[in-house]
Structure formats: C-alpha cells, structure tokens
C-alpha cells in the first residue's frame, strides 16, 4: 500500500539579492543573497517542522543549479527539477522593502522556470507518496506553460484525492499584461485557500462591500472577512477553509492578526503589534506552512489559526526569506 505522506509544492526557486537601502553594499562590495520563492519558503518551513516535502521546480544545468539542488536536499526537501540550459530567476529587494510594492525588481524573464514546459516528470512520479499539493498564484502568472501545468496538476491532485491549497499571493508587477481573474479556473480544485480580502477581490472579483478606514481595530474587517468567505463558499463549495492575514504598517510599526473560516464560522487570532520589524519577506509563506502543518496534524481549528498567526508574526523578526531554527511550531 502506498504511503501517502508527502507535501508537494510547485513553484519557482529564486535568488533574492538584498542590498541595503543606503547603497553601502557598493563600497563594501558585499551583497546579501537569500534563496527564496513562495513555494520554496513554504517547503523549507514544513521540512524544518519534520514534514516530508517535495518541490517541483526547474533548475539550470550548471554549477548554480547543482549547488541549489544540494542545498534543498540538505534541508530535507526532495527535489523534482527538470534541468535545462539557462539561468535561475532573481529579484532585488532592499532589506527594508516590501514584496507588495514597487521597491521589488524582478529579473525572472527568461529563466529556466519561465521557459520550462514541465514535461520532465510523469504524473505518477510527481504524485508518488503525495497527500497534499500547494501552489501560490505567483506560479501561474509566470508563463502560459506554468498556468496550464497548475491547472493540470491541481485537477490531477483532486482525481487522486490529494488535498490542494492555494495562496492568493497578489503581485501587481506579475499581472500587468494579463487578467488575474483567470485564477478562477483553478478554484474548483482548491480545498484550502489563503490570502486576504483585497487579494480575493483582485483574483476572484468578490468585492469589498464594507467601508474600511484602514484602522487595525476596524470591526468592518471581520465583517468583510466573513462575508468574503461566505461568497467564496457559495461560488466554490469545495473550499473548506479560508484564511486571511491582516498586516498593517505605519512607518516601522506593525499590527497583525489573522482569521480562519472553517466549519461555517469565522475564527479570529490573537492580535500582535511591534514598534519595529526586521524583515517583510516570507511572513505569509510561513503562515501558509503553519496552516498546512496544523491541518495535516489534525489540530483543532483555533489552534491551527493561532499557531499560524504566531509563526507569521515571529517571521517578521527573522532575516531572509525563510524561517530559521528560532521558530519551532511545537514550542511557540
């Protein structure tokens, strides 16, 4: 009997160049580089928490690709990577920048991932021992091949009774020349959805109906989260859980909380705040990883939410794209 124990993530592996915002890296001739990519960040966290993880991606057929593959395997991640001539995708973001605004500069076209046809592995190879598939909406934005592969493997996952999660990760720069509403084509295969009320509006055309004042304590945020979740459930009844994260920044200060719609009720996490954070990248991915981890373990819904929110908030104080050993989900 097949041991369905692995979590499969499908997405592009990236190098994140992180120059300081003052430009001192030019004189010091020193530039911080992190390995990143939304699905990789999720995979790395899940592996650190002792889940069995596979990453379906593409790597260049050179020493950089070999070193990256070795790094992933060292982290306990099984790698399914079609290797071709080309280069790894990159992005530039200063250490105090935010992935959601114009301070990020992508250099991922062309890359081995955006040029791949993803035909290196059969469905049986991809889904061997897999019980969960995770994708973010970054991946289908990268190429028509990537979009069609997302549709195919999500459909195949459901045919194999594999749970599917989707992170509605909206990056405006990636959707400039295409309609984000095409993500609706993926929704019939999704069981667990993460995002926020604004990304749901962008991707699924479910409008924000309440007047929001941008205040962290605005009760209309919860009303809208509940209303949005009900509309998602109405349109896509296969979606069993809907998570929203709310992060508000004012200068260096941050306020944070999250919600989870499950069993037809809206759960709300503890609220967090800090006067200063260290890192804006990867918090949402760590939330997603914790959400998957909690569901796989069979934890109560409120604990799943609280753990995910706490992990995501803690990630704001960890440099780099992924969590480190300081964030142990079993000892929060």
Question: What residue ranges belong to the model's regions?
Answer:
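Conserved N-terminal subdomain of the carbohydrate kinase-like
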Residues: 52-140, 166, 330-332
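Conserved post-catalytic alpha-helical subdomain immediately downstream of the catalytic base
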Residues: 267-332
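Glycine-rich phosphate/adenosyl-contacting loop at the front of the ribokinase-like
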Residues: 1-77, 97-99, 118, 276-280
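Active-site beta-loop-alpha junctions enriched in small/polar residues
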Residues: 109, 138, 169-173, 198, ...
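Conserved phosphate/ATP/ADP-binding segment of small-molecule kinases
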Residues: 174-263
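Acidic-glycine-rich active-site phosphate/pyrophosphate-binding loop
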Residues: 8-23, 254-270
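Catalytic-core regions built around general acid/base machinery
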Residues: 148-161, 181-189
